[in-house]
């Protein structure tokens, strides 16, 4: 069996450290060095376990601890070391002077991991992944670039058109007012226009113009043979223009009077004198 943890011993204090305990630990390590962490609490006059003293010194009391934000070079080093070592924060902190393992772990979970996810990289395997929401954010950043027109021209040949089309549909949901060239949808179409253009188009049948003229020629010939005298009846020799002008034209008013007169005489009938009405009475 292994050794029992030092924290399980009776009389060991737990909980937050006080300023007096911090000063005792700093003074002892400054004069004697850390030495053996299991015997340090007793020698320093602390009612703490060795592990608690080590973590307190390593993460908070060391004079060479670097405070503040992580630089870009430090983040890139953490990403490279994490791709090889995984979640071994103590080993990663040993290669970053001034940074503690606890601080590196917190910065990884709160900043670096989210940045990798937004960039389309799996934070566990460090391999690219095609997550739809992450891909739409990538395309959103790509649309804002000034040289996007040249990239969009060759987008269909570089990436899968189906994925790009789906991402272009998801982009307006995330950004209500997207700014990107209008010819993006044309560039993201599947390359099937060449096959469609290669299909022969149906030729529309047109009637030749000489057919119409040839069909009208016999009719024109027949009209030429028929004279005006054959169509109009001959005028009488006594016909004179003066007689035509002297004949009064019937007005619509006269025509209506004549129609009323004819209708009144149409219903006139006479009763014979020898008609006896009693013969028809019952």
Swiss-Prot record:
Entry keyword set: DNA-binding, Nucleus, Phosphoprotein, Repeat, Stress response, Transcription, Transcription regulation
SMART domains (alphabetical): SANT
GO terms for MF: DNA-binding transcription factor activity; transcription cis-regulatory region binding
Gene3D superfamilies named in the record: Homeodomain-like
GO cellular component, one term: nucleus
PTM notes: Phosphorylated at Ser-251 by MPK6 in response to salt stress. Phosphorylation is required for its function in salt stress tolerance.
GO biological process assignments: cuticle hydrocarbon biosynthetic process; multidimensional cell growth; negative regulation of DNA-templated transcription; regulation of primary metabolic process; regulation of raffinose metabolic process
Region of interest (Disordered), residue spans: 180-213
One Pfam entry name: Myb_DNA-binding
DNA-binding region, residue intervals: 37-61, 89-112
Modified sites of kind Phosphoserine: 251
Induction or repression: Induced by salt stress. Induced by osmotic stress. Induced by abscisic acid.
Compartments in which it is found: Nucleus
Coiled coil: none
Domain HTH myb-type residue range list: 9-65, 66-116
InterPro entries: Homeodomain-like_sf, Myb_dom, Myb_TF_plants, SANT/Myb
Compositionally biased spans, kind Polar residues: 183-213
Subunit comment: Interacts with MPK6.
Function: Transcription factor involved in salt stress response. Confers tolerance to salt stress. Involved in distinct cellular processes in response to osmotic stress, including control of primary metabolism and negative regulation of short-term transcriptional responses to osmotic stress. Can activate the steps necessary for aliphatic suberin synthesis and deposition of cell wall-associated suberin-like lamellae. Involved in the production of aliphatic suberin under abiotic stress conditions.
Descriptive protein name: Transcription factor MYB41
Organism: Arabidopsis thaliana
Organismal lineage: Eukaryota, Viridiplantae, Streptophyta, Embryophyta, Tracheophyta
Encoding gene, per UniProt annotation: MYB41
């Amino acid at each position: 069996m292994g050794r029992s943890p030092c924290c399980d011993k009776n009389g060991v204090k737990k909980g937050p450290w006080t300023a007096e305990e911090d000063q005792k630990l700093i003074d002892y390590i400054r004069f004697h060095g850390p030495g053996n962490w299991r015997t340090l609490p007793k020698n320093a006059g602390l009612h703490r376990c060795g592990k608690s003293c080590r973590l307190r010194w390593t993460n908070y009391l060391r004079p060479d601890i670097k405070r503040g934000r992580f630089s870009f070079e430090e983040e890139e080093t953490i990403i490279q070391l994490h791709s090889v070592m995984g979640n071994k924060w103590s080993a990663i902190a040993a290669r970053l002077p001034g940074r503690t393992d606890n601080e590196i772990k917190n910065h990884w979970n709160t900043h670096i991991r989210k940045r990798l996810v937004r960039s389309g990289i799996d934070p566990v395997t460090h391999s690219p992944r095609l997550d739809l929401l992450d891909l739409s954010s990538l395309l959103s950043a790509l649309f804002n670039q000034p040289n996007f027109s040249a990239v969009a021209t060759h987008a269909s040949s570089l990436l899968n058109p189906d994925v790009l089309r789906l991402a272009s549909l998801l982009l307006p949901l995330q950004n209500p007012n997207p700014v990107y060239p209008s010819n993006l949808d044309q560039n993201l179409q599947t390359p099937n226009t060449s096959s469609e253009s290669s299909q022969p188009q149906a030729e529309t049948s047109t009637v030749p113009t000489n057919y119409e003229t040839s069909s009208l020629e016999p009719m024109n010939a027949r009209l030429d043979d028929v004279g005006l005298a054959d169509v109009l009846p001959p005028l009488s020799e006594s016909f004179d223009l003066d007689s035509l002008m002297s004949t009064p034209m019937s007005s619509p008013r006269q025509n209506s009077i004549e129609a009323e007169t004819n209708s009144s005489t149409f219903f006139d009938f006479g009763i014979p004198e020898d008609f006896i009405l009693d013969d028809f009475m019952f």
